[in-house]
């Protein structure tokens, strides 16, 4: 076996082992995320070892033919499963995750097809002299691999968009890099760099996902306060509008229905805010029952506010205890962020007073009708 390839495989396995330990010891990943990354890293390591075995036993005495066949079968069969394990770590609410079970079924069907065609050498063959060769339908393996990578790319971009992640476009060059490397490997099979590249990209994917999740508020899925503070520094230069939201009488919800129901209310309100504003700006939870949105311009402000109230009213038909939400806004005009926030807060408090006065007037009107 080529010493260069042996060194690459050793580096590959060391990196994967390190990533497994890092994943297991992580305090920021949940159980599902840990499981997905651990399975992906372990599977990549196993396939890397299988590739070493195929190279060692290829051309060896015919007694090793069974090992050559088995190693190639498992290597070609399990390769498309690597992107599936990486999709598994993504948020379960993502639309693209709904077809995950179908993708797993496709992988199972592919494994059965590969096993059934072994005697005919359609995808690959190992001669009686124990020599490996690609089959006439080797492209089926290539198609499965590219389809799995495409699925991972689309799933990640969709999830990143749902999480309002600004770096989601970085997924495209990563996918293109792996696709180009695969083409080179197909054209020059003696290089044996595929799994080193897959390992590199899986590590980058781990970093990308960790960064994406670290920007989120765990309860609501909106961007968190740290993201807000970093973004407002940019808004001071580029301009825009700060919209702040406060949940009316939220303490009463917690006191009357408990904190679990209060958390449900916050999650529902956050979802409505994101649906109303996400296309025009970035949505944040900056503490307790306080939310804010950084809009790119003032033109969409009124329309988004109207949409939010409509969404809340619709959601309140199902979840009756959902409280009202007051909002205030202020435009960035070059001054300090604190000053902009102060103006937005003053507008918010004025809106809350108007909301309370309106609610009191409606209650008084209802009481008058009952008395009459």
What residues fall within each predicted segment?
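Hydrophobic alpha-helical transmembrane segments of multi-pass membrane proteins
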Residues: 8-62, 68-85, 103-121, 170-186
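Alpha-helical transmembrane segments in multipass membrane proteins, preferentially the mid-helix core
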Residues: 19-23, 85-88, 142-163
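Catalytic-core segments of nucleotide cyclases and related cyclic-nucleotide turnover enzymes
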Residues: 309-312, 326, 330-372
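Membrane-interface helix-boundary motifs at transmembrane edges
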Residues: 24-37, 88-100, 157-167
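Extracellular-loop-to-transmembrane junctions of the mid-late helices
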Residues: 3-11, 116-151, 185-191
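Signal-transducing coiled-coil linker helices
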Residues: 155-157, 161-219, 226-240
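Conserved long alpha-helical elements within nucleotide-processing catalytic cores of c-di-GMP signaling
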Residues: 224-241, 251-278, 284-288, 292-293, ...
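Short catalytic/binding micro-motifs of nucleotide second-messenger systems
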Residues: 275-280, 304-322, 350
């Amino acid at each position: 076996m080529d010493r260069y390839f042996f060194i690459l495989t050793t580096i590959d396995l060391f990196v994967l082992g390190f990533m497994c330990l890092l994943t297991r010891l992580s305090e920021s990943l949940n159980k599902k995320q840990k499981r997905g990354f651990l399975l992906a890293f372990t599977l990549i390591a196993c396939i890397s070892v299988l590739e070493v075995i195929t190279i060692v036993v290829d051309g060896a005495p015919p007694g090793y033919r069974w090992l050559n066949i088995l190693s190639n079968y498992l290597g070609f069969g399990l390769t498309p499963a690597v992107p599936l394990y990486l999709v598994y770590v993504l948020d379960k609410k993502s639309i693209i995750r709904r077809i995950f079970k179908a993708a797993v079924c496709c992988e199972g069907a592919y494994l059965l097809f590969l096993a059934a065609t072994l005697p005919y050498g359609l995808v690959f063959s190992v001669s009686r002299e124990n020599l490996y060769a690609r089959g006439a339908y080797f492209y089926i393996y290539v198609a499965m691999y590219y389809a799995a990578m495409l699925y991972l790319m689309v799933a990640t971009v969709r999830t990143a968009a749902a999480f309002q992640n600004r770096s989601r476009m970085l997924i495209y060059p990563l996918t293109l890099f792996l696709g180009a490397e695969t083409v080179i490997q197909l054209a020059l099979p003696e290089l044996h760099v595929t799994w080193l590249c897959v390992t590199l990209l899986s590590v980058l994917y781990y970093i990308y996902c960790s960064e994406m999740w670290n920007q989120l508020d765990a309860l609501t899925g909106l961007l968190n306060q740290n993201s807000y503070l970093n973004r407002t520094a940019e808004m001071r230069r580029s301009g825009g509008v700060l919209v702040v939201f406060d949940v009316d009488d939220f303490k009463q919800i917690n006191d009357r229905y408990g904190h679990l129901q209060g958390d449900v209310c916050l999650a529902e309100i956050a979802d409505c805010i994101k649906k109303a504003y996400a296309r025009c700006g970035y949505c944040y939870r900056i503490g307790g029952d306080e939310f804010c949105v950084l809009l790119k311009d003032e033109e969409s402000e009124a329309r988004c506010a109207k949409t939010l109230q409509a969404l809340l009213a619709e959601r309140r038909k199902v979840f009756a205890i959902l409280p009202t939400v007051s909002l205030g806004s202020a435009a960035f005009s070059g001054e300090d962020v604190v000053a902009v926030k102060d103006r937005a807060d003053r507008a918010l408090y004025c809106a809350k007073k108007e909301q309370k006065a309106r609610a009191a007037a409606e209650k008084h009107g209802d009481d008058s009708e009952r008395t009459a």
